[in-house]
């Protein structure tokens, strides 16, 4: 029988079994390596209230904390919520990672330190 994908929709190579996790959206059991992962960094306060809080704040150099969340989606929820898209057969062979999104005002990241 023909193979549809090079990796059989799994990132496990040589492992017989991987622990399942639950989808963030629908709570379906998904193998850890098959789940689509998304790491979200958000401000705890929405953008509209940031200025109000900074004006009222006693500490002038206080930086509002951020919310760090790792989301795990099953394949169907990831497609439905447009985290990933359907790609053509030729496009599926393209293994380059998607371009990183950087906000316009963000400073460029410093290069890593040599060890």
Swiss-Prot record:
It comes from Homo sapiens (Human). GO terms for molecular function: mRNA binding; structural constituent of ribosome. The keyword Ribonucleoprotein applies. Residues 87-97 have a biased composition (Basic and acidic residues). Belongs to the eukaryotic ribosomal protein eS26 family. Pfam families: Ribosomal_S26e (PF01283). InterPro entries: Ribosomal_eS26, Ribosomal_eS26_CS, Ribosomal_eS26_sf. Keywords: Ribonucleoprotein, Ribosomal protein. The keyword Ribonucleoprotein applies. The gene is RPS26P11. It comes from the Eukaryota. One of its GO terms (cellular component) is cytosolic small ribosomal subunit. GO terms for biological process: translation. This is Putative ribosomal protein eS26-like. Residues 86-115 are annotated as: Disordered. PROSITE patterns: RIBOSOMAL_S26E (PS00733).
